[in-house]
Curated annotation (Swiss-Prot):
HAMAP family documented for this protein: Thymidy_synth_bact (MF_00008)
Any single GO BP term: methylation
Subunit structure: Homodimer.
Record: active site: 172 (nucleophile)
PANTHER family: THYMIDYLATE SYNTHASE (PTHR11548:SF2), THYMIDYLATE SYNTHASE 1 (PTHR11548)
Domain of life, source organism: Viruses
Family matches, as Pfam families: Thymidylat_synt
PROSITE patterns the record matches: THYMIDYLATE_SYNTHASE
Disulfide bonds: none
Name of the encoding gene: TS
Entry binding sites for dUMP: 27, 152-153, 192-195, 203, 233-235
Binding positions ((6R)-5,10-methylene-5,6,7,8-tetrahydrofolate): 195, 289
Transport among keywords: no
Originating organism: Herpesvirus ateles
Name of the protein this chain belongs to: Thymidylate synthase
Amino acid sequence: MEELHAEHQYLSQVKHILNCGNFKHDRTGVGTLSVFGMQSRYSLEKDFPLLTTKRVFWRGVVEELLWFIRGSTDSKELAASGVHIWDANGSRSYLDKLGLFDREEGDLGPVYGFQWRHFGAEYQGLKHNYGGEGVDQLKQIINTIHTNPTDRRMLMCAWNVLDVPKMALPPCHVLSQFYVCDGKLSCQLYQRSADMGLGVPFNIASYSLLTCMIAHVTDLVPGEFIHTLGDAHVYVNHVDALTEQLTRTPRPFPTLKFARKVASIDDFKANDIILENYNPYPSIKMPMAV
């Protein structure tokens, strides 16, 4: 019996939300169909779970993840690499709408990268040198994999209650846990808020890539990515686009390799990360709710 393509998990989740989701008003004013609590699992051993039923912005996945790893909170730094997915949240008008009038344009506050690399440090703007401040959760996980791989405390948390009011956008993907078994590294992500149309395909790829990168620098092989969703939702203005996507049959996933041996997570460059045999359907335009 032929094994079902892993992408069908995502498509089935979308279909279930469209058929059974509860209509909810939301902070963006767009409105969503929503289901609470979903999970999917993607093997990272032979191929890489970049969805094929629409083209996913792979370069954006890579550049954003490297930006997180650098601990950056500057949307203009990401934009300089040609990736503009955070521009709206760092705009002057958006920051003013949040009451962050003194915040420099592009300064997103203590968002993902800051929490990953400087958890607990006092946020003092994007130009401050945070070297040695706070807890470097990412480095701590890598060190623990080396020294105590059976540890059950390999967690990286982006949700810092004290810092949430200072963030242009509180984290949607809030908690990841890493797990080593039989020489394989796996990751489970808890995502409190899951935009099925735009965010989730990106998040699957991003945390799968992070898992592969950490496995590479710790001399393990990638195992599995498990994606647990809290509020899984479809924006009402994405319904038609996702209905079209559901008509498409998944194609084989691409494969991932690294161009060289990289010793430290901080040493990865975009051209070290090579995606091969990605043959998706055309992209489907969906507006971003801000």
